[in-house]
Amino acid sequence: MRVVRVQYKGSVFFGALQDDGVVCLNHQLGLKDPIPLAELSILPVVAPSKIICAGMNYRDHAAEIGFPVPDEPVFFLKAPTAVIGSGQPILVPQGVGRVDYEGELALVVGRQCRNISPDAVPANIFGYTCANDVTARDLQRRDGLFGRCKGYDTFCPVGPWIETDLSDTANLAVRTLVNGEVRQQGNTADMLFTPNEMVSAISRVMTLLPGDLILTGTPVGIGPIAPGDEVRVEIEQVGLLINPVLAAPDGDEHAEVPLQ
């Protein structure tokens, strides 16, 4: 099943994507089925409490960025406000230098869990989606940390939907294209740690909540993007994530929303 997150007449809900619209999965709302796409606002597939990203989970990628190959899963956090959906623009901030794409398979947590074994992971995962761990590479090298270089708004495109029927992640082609040219061509079979091993390791550190997003690492072939480009992340049996790249606008942007 391909699941999307939508807004309809003030309600936000998950729905099953069909040829003629979206079937609401929250039957308590009592909505007609299916709802035509033209009547819906398509939202990013998740609004996570946190985004956890695997680091150096492909041997060749670790080599290309000059990091040692880890002997156990390593991971870092990415700001939840970085999430955007398919079709929304990646905004490149002024003065950050080189900005790179990183195509990745991502998992969406379905149940609250902690301290779970690798074998128990599938029962706690809602589904899978495509992700792009956009990274300000010059800042990464300068800071030696990942918070700033990966935390900008729009630096975590995900989508176009959540695939819930994927039973095996062991051999999936992962491709990233920029302006139609293939830049990354990898396979999940080359991961150092499987998605189940990665999720289990994360769960031993922090409680995972429904909707949390886990990125499983990027294969070799990272490279720069710039305003005017189009980036596509394509994962076999999962989907195709498409985002244009634009320059971030000048000036302050804020809304007067009081603390609740």
Q: For the regions a protein language model found, what residue spans apply to each?
A:
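Short, conserved beta-strand element in jelly-roll/cupin
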Residues: 76, 106-111, 199-200
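N-terminal accessory regions of nucleic-acid-interacting proteins
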Residues: 114-128
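Short catalytic-site patches enriched in acidic/histidine residues
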Residues: 77-91, 113-114, 154-160, 215, ...
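Extended, compositionally biased flexible segments
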Residues: 2-94, 101, 260
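Catalytic-pocket segment enriched in acidic/His residues
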Residues: 18, 38-44, 61, 69, ...
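Short coil/turn connectors at secondary-structure junctions
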Residues: 47-49, 70-72, 79, 95-96, ...
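Residues embedded in well-ordered beta-strands
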Residues: 104-108, 129, 175
